[in-house]
Amino acid sequence: MSTEPYRPRRRARSFFVTARGLRQHLLEWGDPSLTRDDRPTLVMLHGWMDVAASFQFVVDAFAEDRHVVALDWRGFGASATPAADTYFFPEYVGDLELVLDELFGRARAPIDLLGHSMGGNVAMLYAGTRPDKVRRLVNLEGFGMPRSKPSHAPGRMARWLDELRTPMQLRPYPNVEAVADRLTKTNPLLRADRAAWLAGQWSGPTGNGDERALLADANHKRMSPLNAQVDDWLELYKRITAPLLWIEGDRSDVSVWWGNRYTKAEFHERLDVVADAQRHVVGPAGHMLHHDRPEDIAGLLEAFLSESRPPRIEPS
């Protein structure tokens, strides 16, 4: 049975900026003329092994046009790959700051900031570090990381040293259809037309016939030698002054990543330190909820971003 191809309702413009010595790729929907003080640019941050184009379905589902910018993180999509063989989390926060400088200047007005998964983690840290630069904050399943014990540090460092001896690799796919098949196998809730469209955004030709490779640096798979500093993250969460919208899928399962080391309940306790947080569950949806339920996400976003709330004073 044939499936009609997905056709974006709102076309994205592709462009690049140079920040921190790297050529960083962005997508833009709408026009800056659509912004106002109470309707600033919405900046979207994708997750690990994802790309900026992943937000296309949510942008298409908006009832009204708005100015949206999405960033390909370093080593993903069309952004440049750094020379280093290991990725450290603060690098993403630094990239966001300097990319925003390039887009809006250092004296910029507050933006609306959304992140999914890893991008949600970055968004939370950034909003706690630069609370005066974020008007509204949206986190789509950026659960953070499990607590690590200091006793884990020696073994973690040793495993990282061992990993450095072997180049990381991402397997190629015979064609773009195989990429789409992998997407639907990983996420059975993903519609076939969306999977086919995403496959063309997530992968690129290798030069070997129809073969495709994911647009991601394989070094993203290498572990960090450092324990997660959960208490540091929580201090930043406490400094978030923007209203926060948290959205999760009803079928997402954090045990897939961390077993019994970290639960949704523990993360929800962490959210309690954020002064102004709304929480929503959408479904049926898994971790890729922006693919599964883009219409629900768009509706929640538009309602949340249009709310009128007085700003909270930054804690001293």
Region annotations inferred by a language model:
Residues 1-42, 63-66, 104-107, 161-162, ...:
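Alpha/beta-hydrolase fold catalytic core
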Residues 140-173:
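A catalytic-pocket lid/entrance helix-loop region that shapes and gates access to the active site
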Residues 241-285:
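Conserved loop-alpha-helix segment in the C-terminal half of the alpha/beta-hydrolase fold
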Residues 25-81:
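Conserved HGGG/HGGXW glycine-rich cap/lid loop of the alpha/beta-hydrolase fold
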Residues 169-227:
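Conserved alpha/beta-hydrolase catalytic His-Asp/Glu region
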Residues 282-294:
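Catalytic histidine-centered segment of alpha/beta-hydrolase-like enzymes
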Residues 109-152:
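Conserved hydrolase catalytic core segment
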Residues 93-109:
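Conserved acidic catalytic loop of the alpha/beta-hydrolase fold
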